[in-house]
């Protein structure tokens, strides 16, 4: 019985052990193969990522270059479009010399202020004609009163002073009547105050 059990155990155990050993060998080979494939896949992924990154960078660089070129072209076109406008505005707005000439011409055209105290009054000599008691100057632009003698001049002076005083009073009254203040309203007595001021200036 003992020999039979040993024979059966060996007959059954030896093939099972051989099969297990062979399975272990194949499993180890498969594990090594899987590890190699994983390493290859990792390398391939790295290469693909590098290629994708390079392609993306190249595309981005190309887009930047194209956008910069387009912007430079647009700037050049804008500058070319603005040049005639700037030239037109410069031509149209360049007027300093014209203004200087205009100011100079206006300065020459403006008459100089002359004092009224130094007016050359013409004098009538004997033999000259008199037109209604007034003397005309050569340019026929002004009329001056006739002065013939000293007595007449003194009388004329006194009359002129009296006439001046009366005329000043009349003009003051006339201005007082015709005076119209645009800022006057119901709440101000500007005309009354002005009349009182004018009355205070009159001789008493």
Swiss-Prot record:
Transmembrane annotation, as ranges: 6-26
Subcellular location: Vacuole membrane
Record carries keyword Transferase: no
Gene Ontology, cellular component aspect: vacuolar membrane
Membrane topology qualifier: Single-pass membrane protein
Superkingdom of origin organism: Eukaryota
Keyword terms of this UniProt record: Cell cycle, Membrane, Transmembrane, Transmembrane helix, Vacuole
Main location: membrane
Known function: Involved in cell cycle progression and surviving DNA damage.
UniProt similarity note: Belongs to the SKG1 family.
Protein name: Altered inheritance of mitochondria protein 20
Organism: Saccharomyces cerevisiae (strain YJM789)
Gene: AIM20
